[in-house]
Amino acid sequence: MSLLIKNGTIVNDDAMFKSDVLVHDGKIVEIAPSIDPTPGLEVVDATDRFVIPGGIDPHTHMQLPFMGEVAKDDFHRGTEAAVAGGTTMIIDFVIPTKGESLLVAYDRWRGWADPKVVCDYGLSMAITSWGQEIAKEMEMVTKADYGINSFKFFLAYAGVFMVRDEEFYQGMLQCAKLRALARVHAENGAVIAERCEHLLSSGITGPEGHTQSRPEELEAEATFRACTMASQANCPLYVVHVMSKGAAAAIAHHRKKGAVVFGEPIAAGLATDGSHYYNEDWLHAARYIMSPPLSRDPSTPNALMKLLAAGELHLTATDNCTFDCHQKSLGKDDFTKIPNGVNGVEDRMSVVWDKGVHAGIIDPMKFVAVTSTMAAKIFNCYPRKGRIAVGSDADIVVWNANATRTISKDTHHHAIDFNIFEGMQVHGVPETTICRGRIVWADGQLRTVQGAGRFVPLPPDSQIVFSAVDNRGKALEPVKVERAPYVATTLEAPDANANIVVKTRSAVPPGGISSIQF
């Protein structure tokens, strides 16, 4: 199967240039200023358009069983929404239940995804329990047969997913040994649990209780703590869904000291804020429930985008985990029972373009970096993914920077009945999405085939991650001080009949006079 993209401007993370792109059997086979079409070759006209690498969303939760419900976007609907928005690969999370084998959970996720995906996908593994067997299974799943190169640790959701600090630290030591990336959901789960109990007992049962139970300081504290522990373990760390300025500042602090830390803001946090939690319409407020919550500071979205521009944050994701209005309403009398999660996989690319490029904060090359290339590099599938180059997979988007669209639940492809970006007009629209040489989105219509996507194994030892770790490790090697053997001085026992003199002095503490013996 072949196709030719003509007259476009190729945008990679490091260059922009006009060129044609020839695709054959799922790969890019030629890039040249002008390629003549052969008879029968399908041609995509990209005049006045950008030709960019397909987006990579490194953080999704398709059909996740969570809080007694199952996320509505399964691997079919979720990946259809992805390609409609210009994303051609997702990285989803295998999340075992407490005490469950990683291998059993892995097989379950592959069984869900393989028959349904319409684009390529990879997997990351959550560690929800700890012990020697888990450590052994971590090593197993980093082998080529499984293709896992990152492990996520939750410092929230006490009693469900959360691990203790010592378990987190031991897990990071194992990650470092395996040359795998540690990822962290950074919140203070113990304090959150106490705050939830206090708020409920005080009569605060609505969605506003969610954000009040999770003040930004707790995200910042947990992020700082996680970075500190990762630094001690000399383990690279990837902080998922950075939602606040404080968390971003914690990452920047440790990076300046040489720690290898990556920060991931998400579409929701770049486009809207936590004022929704105080909306008088209960259901409106509940739709935005996620953890960590959206920042109550309205300047945060713009600040996070500027940190992406400055390289203090590194790539964008969505944490796509969708629950419909009925599922959200299960927590109508108790905010802790509202399923956590929002949409984003369809709208991320347009949101980042609108809030970043159209706003004049980032350029098109940086857009490609934070929506595709950095994810490919960090998760070790570059340049197969994340680049327009000969030999790369033909995951390509023809992008119209001048077009606009209005986001709506009535036109999106998610399996839910609302959209957190409802009514937002965004600049930048994917006109054509190509997955491994197949057009899957064009003219506003899906052309997908269920199960046509493929699993992409992600090998450990990413160069962009571990080259810095290795350099840092040399400076952190323990230093032994060579000393002459210490010879203790033997003291003679005191004479029991010797007079013992006790010296005293007066001390005058505030409020009175006292004689204190020393």
Swiss-Prot record:
Q: Does the keyword Metal-binding apply?
A: yes
Q: Does the keyword Metal-binding apply?
A: yes
The entry marks the following residues as binding Zn(2+) 1, namely H59, H61, K152, D319
As stated in the Swiss-Prot or TrEMBL entry, residues carrying the post-translational modification N6-carboxylysine are K152
Disulfide links within the chain: none
Write down any Gene Ontology CC term. Answer: cytosol
- EC number annotated for this UniProt entry: 3.5.2.2
InterPro entries hit by this protein = Amidohydro-rel (IPR006680), Hydantoinase/dihydroPyrase (IPR011778), Metal-dep_hydrolase_composite (IPR011059), Metal_Hydrolase (IPR032466), Metallo-dep_Hydrolases_sf (IPR050378)
Cofactors, names only: Zn(2+)
Q: How is it modified after translation?
A: Carboxylation allows a single lysine to coordinate two zinc ions.
Q: Which reaction does it catalyse?
A: 5,6-dihydrouracil + H2O = 3-(carbamoylamino)propanoate + H(+)
Instruction: Give the Gene Ontology MF terms in alphabetical order.
Output: dihydropyrimidinase activity; metal ion binding
User: Which keywords accompany this UniProt record?
Assistant: Hydrolase, Metal-binding, Zinc
> What are the GO BP annotations of this UniProt entry?
pyrimidine nucleobase catabolic process
Q: What CDD domains does this protein's entry cite?
A: D-HYD
> How is its cofactor bound, per UniProt?
Binds 2 Zn(2+) ions per subunit.
Task: Name the positions where substrate binds.
Answer: Y157, S291, N340
Q: For Zn(2+) 2, which residues are the binding ones?
A: K152, H185, H241
- Report the sequence similarity comment from the record: Belongs to the metallo-dependent hydrolases superfamily. Hydantoinase/dihydropyrimidinase family.
Kindly state the subunit structure of this protein.
Answer: Homotetramer.
Supply the name of the protein.
Answer: Dihydropyrimidinase 2
Q: Which organism is it from?
A: Caenorhabditis briggsae
Q: What is the lineage of its organism?
A: Eukaryota, Metazoa, Ecdysozoa, Nematoda, Chromadorea
Quote the gene name from the UniProt entry: dhp-2
